[in-house]
Design a protein with these regions (language model features):
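Electropositive phosphate-/nucleotide-binding environments in soluble metabolic enzymes
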Residues: 2-5, 15-22, 32-39, 73, ...
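Short beta-strand segments at enzyme active-site cores
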Residues: 20-21, 91-93, 201
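Hydrophobic pocket-lining residues that define ligand/cofactor binding sites across diverse proteins
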Residues: 28, 83, 191
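Conserved short-loop catalytic and cofactor-binding motifs
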Residues: 29, 95-96, 171-175
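Glycine-rich anion-binding loops and their surrounding alpha/beta cores
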Residues: 43, 47-52, 72, 87, ...
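Core alpha/beta catalytic barrel or barrel-like domain that forms the active/cofactor pocket
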Residues: 55-63, 91-97, 159-162
């Protein structure tokens, strides 16, 4: 797990070439990521994120791993907006589509939601409308080294699994959808080692 953590940090900090990063990610995928490796990666990513401060009380993220390869409906975004309309405080963290036709950012942008929300805007948005969307590239500058590699590989990697776990607002609750049943235990065990108070992995 320590070697995997060091490799992940090297990718995040741009110390690996694209070829090296691709081999590392493929190796982890073939071996199978462990909850401890995932927990280390979560900590490394959150440590490099633009953190959201000053949130009080409970809030939830509704998010999915994506990558099911079926061009399926983005139900996490619809669910998040429904919960916000019901009065729950939703701080959704997401990105544009990588392996599908519509990621959460694409859907919300199409509905007129801004993608340029800054860390200091999140509390106000939650107070005003119970909903804030954190566009991942604005909060994870170190991920700029990762996007081209993910697109070139074109398959699920550690980063598909990691994205839903690294909300810089550090919500107290999470509803996490997975693309395949075999991912449920891995992500549930990873969340057990995180800051999340309550989680449902479906």
């Amino acid at each position: 797990a320590d070697m995997a953590a060091a490799g992940f940090a090297d990718i995040m900090d741009g110390r690996m070439t694209p070829a090296q990063a691709g081999c590392f990610l493929m190796g982890l995928r073939m071996k199978g990521e462990t909850p401890l490796e995932m927990a280390h990666a979560v900590g490394i990513a959150l440590g490099r994120a633009n953190r959201v401060e000053g949130l009080e009380g409970d809030c939830i993220d509704v998010v999915g791993t994506g990558g099911d390869g079926r061009n399926s409906f983005n139900c996490s975004t619809a669910t998040a907006l429904t919960l916000a309309g019901m009065g729950y405080r939703v701080v959704k963290h997401g990105n544009r589509a990588v392996s599908s036709s519509c990621g959460s950012a694409d859907a919300l942008e199409g509905l007129g939601f801004p993608l340029d929300v800054a860390p200091e805007d999140v509390r106000r948005l939650l107070d005003e409308r119970n909903f804030a969307f954190l566009f991942a590239p604005n909060f994870h500058p170190s991920f700029r080294n990762v996007g081209p590699i993910r697109r070139e590989l074109g398959i699920r990697t550690l980063f598909n699994l990691l994205g839903p776990l690294i909300n810089p607002a550090r919500p107290t609750h999470i509803l996490l959808g997975v693309a395949r049943p075999e991912l449920v235990e891995l992500l549930a065990e990873t969340l057990r080692q995180s800051h999340i108070r309550k989680a449902a992995v479906v």
